[in-house]
């Protein structure tokens, strides 16, 4: 997570200390905490041709949905309740959540229980579709009201229920794979696309569940295609989209990059007084339109 998202590179000088710190932290945690997965009792799902084809087809769909989700997160982060509205917005937002929660109590909390149910195949098509639509909406509703909270688990749970729903629908045409397997693939794909970090997404789903090793190839296919589609749309992530002054999306940076655009080269340029201002988001397209 630190290397791929915060540092933006998986170079050896970063990976070695990161892995060493992770190993020490894990060994220390084993002394005081139970040595079990975050999501318990997840079956060891197996690879199937049906699941593989579904992953290739569902990846782009999940990527488009993730891109829309990222833009929604970005918009609401820049239009949060302020001033007098900040006193009443949380009451209204959580009141709405409470009413919806009468029918869908799975929406309460960060989504951990919702994801766990999806991973074990709990829930029918209608319920999973409803949750996959409502969870992002209540997340941005609470975020826009001024409430603080992380986005990792809500995003993972949304991908899980969405993957489960699409998988149940797929099973009507090509049965053979359990809904929980589709949920795990969907969770990895949406997390990878939303964070713009496919390696992190794959590793986290495997480690949080201690399962899914038979699904690595479908997970990889869905996660890579979903991340690529979301990247092509604008390249933002759920983290960069929330920044007060957003940098250009990675896609626009790469498409307009100079030969010295790498982080290491940029640091060298800054040291020698050669730093350049990055292009504003959309500046390239505006210049192109202005020029005809």
Positions of the model-derived regions?
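Alpha-helical transmembrane segments and immediately membrane-proximal extracytoplasmic
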Residues: 1-292
